[in-house]
Amino acid sequence: SGRPADARTALHIDRCLSCLSCMTTCPSGVNYMHLVDEARAYVEETYERPLFERLLRNVLAYTMPRPGLFRLSLIGAKIASPLAPVARSLGATRIAALLGLVPKRMPVPERIGQPGTYRATGQKKGRVALLMGCVQSVLDPGINAATIRLLTRLGYEVVVSGEEACCGSLTHHMGLEHDALARARRSIDQWTRADVDAVIVTASGCGTTIKDYGHMLRHDAAYAEAAKAISAKAKDVTEFLMMQELPDAQGGLRLAYHSACSMQH
């Protein structure tokens, strides 16, 4: 309708987790994912958030896509975390809540996962790129390291460019389309030059965005085709493993598997 977004609209859109269950259950097949993406961008463009909210979102949007800076921020927040009760008593409940999210122990960076090419073990089956990501590479670097070990053992050469960092998913879900598209283009450039058979993702939320690059950049004449090609190559690591001939399990090990909502819908 052209009407600027208001606080009620912003709150409603902000509360959407993009689990995409609505798309699975909608009998009419409405693409709510794209509707919500457009709504987030519209809210960001037309609604002036309260000062603290603007500051918080700006800090998160600048810090979290940069792994080095995000790690330093976590260290600083960990040092300040004992002050959470003080912040709560002074009425700064949001700051107290953020301090409460700081990990009890800071993850140690893995040696495996640094930029470079990891050779396949045995006969080479193909060449894949691995998105190291921004937040996950700091909070749980062991996931990417384990993925590299597994893929190379299965015969795949793994390329870690280290230059794409954030794929744009984080700022895309904040409605910051200019930043998100710039990060998407940077990632596309890296993976296109790497000439890989697949782009492996270990964070399903990032995978959802990369698989949508073709739509996000459909009006960009310089990137539309390349974006579509990268979207077609994007695979969650679990999807990619389902395509492989895996050896029989040794037995004696029971595992629990959590299927993320963005993988189910």
PLM region spans:
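Iron-sulfur cluster-binding electron-transfer modules in prokaryotic oxidoreductases
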Residues: 32-265
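A diffuse structural propensity rather than consistent per-protein peaks
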Residues: 6-7, 257
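Well-ordered alpha-helical segments embedded in enzymatic catalytic cores
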Residues: 8-12, 183-186
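Short leucine-rich amphipathic alpha-helices used at interfaces
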Residues: 5-6, 12-13, 56
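Iron-sulfur cluster-binding cysteine motifs and their immediate structural context
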Residues: 1, 10, 15, 19-42, ...
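Signature of N-terminal electron-transfer/Fe-S-associated modules in redox systems
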Residues: 1-6, 130
